[in-house]
């Protein structure tokens, strides 16, 4: 997955996948078996995958799970490069890790026997909370850069913003990006009134005739990183029934809730401040409202820091149905279907910047207000299919196949006045979701071996494909979602067209193992460990803003980026009582 630092507010394909994807936790038993439990059931963790799992138990139970999640990363840095004849050159091994305590499961399942000899033998009601995603992640890297800078990117993307906006007390209520406004406030970008353009404080201004050019002449040390935390949990109300100990049916009303916190930082510092001379340029307003253009004292740029913080609170509702059928004593077949989730997302975000110069009187810092917004989001539907074989009370082998269609993800406004005609603010991102997201396939395999009547060992494996895809276009270029977004109008108008699609080769691979103890009485305990290898993450602190033409073809100077190898380790302990 490729991430670019947020230079403006707005929803993205990455947001849709963050909110829509699941990575099941549940209990230590289900985790230890790789969550290949669609045809197994009998455990509170399995209810979130197949609602029929709650009706398999012949007894009532209460259980809770606790543990920890560790996110690890090994990152490398690549400076900018000319896409005409170069490629990324990653180096360095920056290791990061973060551990958080978790409570992935708690709940109760009540079983009621009917007394019938045939037909419906029992029914159950369960109230459970199962974790379905962890947002724990951290990575960072640093390196030297001598072609591009955050200040240059901010100056480029400020094009069209009036130089007088700095004098407007309501400037954050305008349509201009808050990054650009804050950068102008602190002096990271400056306004050239003669050229009617902005230049970065890390750039040298050259005038040739009536033309101006801006370039970076020195070397910057760049430091950057991302931290995220939070989780998504499904609050489940489950009802099921047991028919002749051969057919188990179940239905869920799921109420997923999530808290997601994300922050990114970027710092750049001049290796030799003498290479970065700068004279600020901006407008001021006196007490009578008269505007005047001011040029500051010549100084040298030392460095700057950029921070972006984002918080989202998410709640939703979906329905789920499933069955488990035993055609013979050893064979079990299961299937479940979950409707798309209707989410409400409430989010807050802000940016913070500071700039330092050799003349300390030019140093400034600025923060945007905290933006608040809410909207609706529709997540994908999910279908699960399972086949299992049990060997009496000695063990079992289970295989699951899960299919999720991410192309149906959709953002929408929370409140719409039907009496007004308006432009859909989410049309662009919804179009990208439909084109560049598709089917994700997930294969899960699990096994359980009962070594003693009271002791079992478990192992599991899962492999999930990427739901993201890319295209080749009529010009022969490979087009990702970010490319289509950049040239959106050209593709939508038919100037360019997409020809053929191919899914990204990224995979999510997990291995797990565990053990379980079941006492002769009511108590039982399970423990499980899982290691997950996530797709490599590519992050750029700012978008490409320089380019040149060779033989009629435009080539970007690709901005610096960080490549991170990501993994997670989970440990879960489940304690339960039957009654």
Q: Locations of the language-model features?
A:
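Sec-dependent signal peptide recognition
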Residues: 1-2
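Outer-membrane beta-barrel porins/channels
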Residues: 11-25, 30, 111-579
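Outer-membrane beta-barrel translocator/receptor signature
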Residues: 28, 40-49, 55-145, 233
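Short, solvent-exposed helix-helix connector turns and helix-capping sites enriched
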Residues: 49-50, 359
């Amino acid at each position: 997955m490729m991430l670019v630092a947020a230079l403006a507010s707005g929803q993205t394909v990455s947001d849709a996948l963050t909110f829509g994807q699941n990575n099941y936790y549940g209990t230590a038993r289900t985790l230890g078996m790789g969550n290949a439990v669609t045809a197994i059931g009998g455990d509170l963790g399995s209810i979130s995958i197949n609602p029929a799992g709650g009706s398999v138990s012949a007894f009532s139970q209460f259980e809770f799970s606790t543990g920890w999640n560790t996110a690890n990363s090994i990152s490398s840095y690549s400076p900018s490069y000319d896409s005409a004849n170069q490629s990324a050159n990653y180096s360095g091994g920056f290791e990061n890790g973060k551990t958080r305590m978790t409570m992935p499961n708690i709940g109760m399942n009540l079983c009621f026997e009917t007394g019938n000899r045939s037909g419906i033998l029992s029914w159950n009601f369960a109230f459970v909370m199962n974790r379905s995603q962890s947002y724990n992640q951290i990575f960072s890297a640093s390196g030297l850069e001598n072609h591009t800078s955050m200040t240059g990117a901010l100056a480029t993307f400020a094009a069209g913003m009036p130089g007088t906006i700095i004098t407007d007390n309501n400037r954050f209520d305008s349509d201009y990006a808050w990054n650009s406004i804050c950068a102008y406030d602190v002096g990271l970008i400056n306004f050239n009134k003669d050229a009617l353009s902005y230049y970065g404080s890390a750039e040298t201004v050259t005038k040739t005739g009536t033309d101006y050019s801006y370039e970076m002449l020195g070397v910057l040390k760049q430091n950057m990183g991302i931290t995220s935390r939070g989780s998504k949990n499904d609050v489940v109300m489950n009802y099921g029934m047991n028919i002749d100990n051969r057919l188990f049916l179940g239905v869920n009303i799921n109420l997923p809730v999530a808290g997601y916190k994300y922050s990114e930082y970027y710092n750049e510092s001049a290796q030799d401040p003498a290479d970065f001379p700068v004279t600020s340029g901006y407008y001021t307003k006196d007490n009578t409202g008269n505007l005047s253009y001011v040029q500051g004292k010549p100084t040298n740029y030392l460095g700057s820091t950029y921070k972006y913080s984002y918080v989202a609170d998410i709640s939703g509702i979906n329905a789920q149905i499933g069955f488990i059928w035993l055609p013979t004593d050893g064979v079990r077949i299961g299937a479940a279907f979950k409707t798309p989730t209707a989410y409400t997302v409430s989010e807050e975000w802000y940016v913070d910047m500071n700039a330092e110069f050799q003349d300390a009187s030019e140093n400034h810092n600025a923060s945007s207000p905290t933006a608040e917004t809410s909207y609706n989001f529709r997540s994908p539907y999910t279908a699960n299919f399972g086949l299992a074989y049990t060997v009496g009370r000695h063990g079992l082998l289970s295989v699951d196949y899960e299919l999720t269609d991410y192309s149906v993800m959709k953002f929408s406004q929370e409140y719409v006045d039907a009496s007004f005609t308006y432009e859909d603010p989410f049309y662009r991102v919804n179009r990208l979701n439909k084109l560049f997201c598709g089917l994700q396939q997930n294969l899960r395999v699990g096994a359980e071996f009962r070594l003693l009547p009271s002791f079992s060992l478990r192992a599991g494996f899962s492999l999930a494909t990427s739901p993201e895809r890319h295209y080749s276009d009529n010009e022969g270029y490979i087009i990702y979602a970010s490319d289509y977004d950049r040239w959106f109008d050209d593709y939508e108008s038919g100037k360019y067209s997409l020809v053929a699609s191919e899914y990204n080769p990224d995979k999510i691979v997990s291995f797990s193992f565990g053990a379980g103890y079941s006492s002769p009485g009511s108590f039982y305990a399970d423990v499980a460990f899982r290691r997950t290898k996530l797709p490599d993450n590519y992050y750029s602190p700012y978008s490409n803003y320089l380019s040149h033409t060779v033989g009629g073809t435009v080539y970007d100077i690709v901005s610096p980026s960080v490549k991170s190898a990501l993994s997670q380790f989970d440990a879960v302990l489940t304690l339960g009582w039957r009654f």
